[in-house]
């Protein structure tokens, strides 16, 4: 159960020189905002890109139907908060950067969001050791990450998706996953690109 004491956002609005202003788009936390320090390496997905992303995702996933989600490279926590707000049964967020992890863990505690579990650790190690399956997996690695292109293969090699699950990877314009055997579709909103993947045989 959520008891909201603050508000969050996911766009690149500015409220002063030290913070980025971020907002939850939809759900029980709609309109809530948080200030994200500009000193963070991670930057939130824009409102425009995020809203369009979830408009596509909801055609594949019913978040309120016992949905279990995994958010990799969580960053500021904006996607995880959308998942919590939209009614996911459980949300696991994996983030290696200590400042980012502390930030999202504090938010989860302040919201008393018992279904939200932030974890601090290396995403690649987590994938290999996870042993669980999810309805929805999202990954937003740094665009310059040299291992970025390997992430879809790792997700499917380690069976992170349930049979009808969906994996979405956010990436820069220089990547093309259309030949990947699990690729479903690609969307781009400004400079933000999303590639969608499902298990073979799932449409």
Question: What does each model-identified segment do?
Answer:
Residues 2-203:
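Class I S-adenosyl-L-methionine-dependent methyltransferase catalytic core
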